[in-house]
């Protein structure tokens, strides 16, 4: 039987080959505070509600 490599300590996406980087740490992440994330999502929800009220459905 063939041996399987154990991917200990790796992200599942990296282990599955879905992300191909030489190192997992190369991915850049957007740093956003929890308050900012809530504010942005609330603003998007409010904008969608306003658009829905102003524009009649087709």
From Swiss-Prot:
Keywords: Cell membrane, Membrane, Protein transport, Translocation, Transmembrane, Transmembrane helix, Transport. It is a single-pass membrane protein. It is found in: Cell membrane. Residues 1-33 are cytoplasmic. The keyword Kinase does not apply. GO terms for cellular component: plasma membrane. Its main location: membrane. Residues 56-58 are extracellular. One of its GO terms (biological process) is protein transport. Signal peptide: none annotated. The chain crosses the membrane at residues 34-55. InterPro entries: Preprot_translocase_SecG, SecG/Sec61-beta/Sbh. Belongs to the SEC61-beta family. Involved in protein export. The function of the beta subunit is unknown, but it may be involved in stabilization of the trimeric complex. Component of the protein translocase complex. Heterotrimer consisting of alpha (SecY), beta (SecG) and gamma (SecE) subunits. Can form oligomers of the heterotrimer. HAMAP family: SecG. This is Preprotein translocase subunit SecG. The lineage of its organism: Archaea, Thermoproteota, Thermoprotei, Thermoproteales, Thermoproteaceae.
């Amino acid at each position: 039987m063939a041996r399987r490599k154990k991917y200990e300590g790796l992200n599942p996406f990296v282990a599955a080959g879905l992300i191909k980087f030489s190192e997992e740490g190369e991915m850049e992440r957007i740093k956003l505070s929890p308050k900012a994330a809530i504010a942005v999502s609330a603003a998007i929800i409010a904008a969608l509600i306003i658009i829905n009220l102003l524009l009649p459905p087709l």
